[in-house]
Structures are given as structure tokens and as C-alpha cells.
């Protein structure tokens, strides 16, 4: 059994929507591509058929992954979150001690992470380093380029 994953209501609904779309529209599109490729004759030398089969495999793997996530997904109740330390759904303002750069991130599940929206995964190196820390503390994060120190300036929800 996979581990339980926690999501915001919005994030879980987005994943459910993706699953529904893939099962209906995605499968229909791939079935149409397979049918068109079959109509072109000999399947042993049919690149379109091979491409459609590969697309089908990728689609089915994503559907299976989303279905597994749904089984183990839980919506986060904000009332049960410790607001004194960094946790999932925390909005964290941090300062890179070496560069002096200040950034704000929201801590989310791996599937909801989107750096462009300022959402980082609690499973990422930075996320793991920040979890459980309090405002004023320094988190040391192991990154490919070496250790990075982040000072936690503020935590909000």
C-alpha cells in the first residue's frame, strides 16, 4: 500500500478532474488514433500504430497512478495543523542566507507542487529542510550544489 498523501481540497479536485478527463476524452482520443493507424494496413511496419500504442501505455500508466493516489488521498483539515512550525499548507517566507534573497512559498503535496505558483512539495529537498522549523530558525538544505542555509522569516496560513 502506498503512503497516505495530503491535499488541499482544490488540489484533490484538480486531480479528480484530470482523472475523469483522461478516462473519457483521453481514452477516446487514443482509441481513435489506434483505429486510424490500423486502417493504414500492415501493423508490423506502421509507425503511427506504434506511436498510438505508446501513447496508450503512457495514458494508462497516468490513469493508474491517479487512481492509486485517490485511494490514499486525504484532504487536509486546516484546523488540525500546528501553526507554530512549518507544515503542509504553511506559507513560508524564507531568506537564502548566502544570497540574501527572500522568497515566499506554500508547502504542498508533491502532486500539487508548482514553482511558478510558489508552491513547493514537502517531499522536495527544500520542503524537507523547512518542515517542522519555526520562525527565526535556520534550515540547512542538502542540494546538488551543496548545503544551502535558509532563515525562516515568517510562517502563515
Swiss-Prot record:
Sequence segments annotated as region (Disordered): 25-47
InterPro entries listed in its UniProt record: GreA/GreB_C_sf, TF_GreA/GreB_CS, Tscrpt_elong_fac_GreA, Tscrpt_elong_fac_GreA/B, Tscrpt_elong_fac_GreA/B_C, Tscrpt_elong_fac_GreA/B_fam, Tscrpt_elong_fac_GreA/B_N, Tscrpt_elong_fac_GreA/B_N_sf
Keyword Glycoprotein among UniProt keywords: no
Keyword DNA damage part of the UniProt annotation: no
GO molecular function, one term: DNA binding
Superkingdom of origin organism: Bacteria
Classification via PROSITE patterns: GREAB_1, GREAB_2
SUPFAM superfamilies xrefs: FKBP-like, GreA transcript cleavage protein, N-terminal domain
GO biological process: DNA-templated transcription elongation; regulation of DNA-templated transcription elongation
Keyword annotations of the record: Coiled coil, DNA-binding, Transcription, Transcription regulation
Coiled coil regions, renumbered to chain: 43-79
Composition-biased stretches (Basic and acidic residues): 25-43
Family: Belongs to the GreA/GreB family.
HAMAP family in alphabetical order: GreA_GreB (MF_00105)
Function description: Necessary for efficient RNA polymerase transcription elongation past template-encoded arresting sites. The arresting sites in DNA have the property of trapping a certain fraction of elongating RNA polymerases that pass through, resulting in locked ternary complexes. Cleavage of the nascent transcript by cleavage factors such as GreA or GreB allows the resumption of elongation from the new 3'terminus. GreA releases sequences of 2 to 3 nucleotides.
Protein name: Transcription elongation factor GreA
Organism name: Amoebophilus asiaticus (strain 5a2)
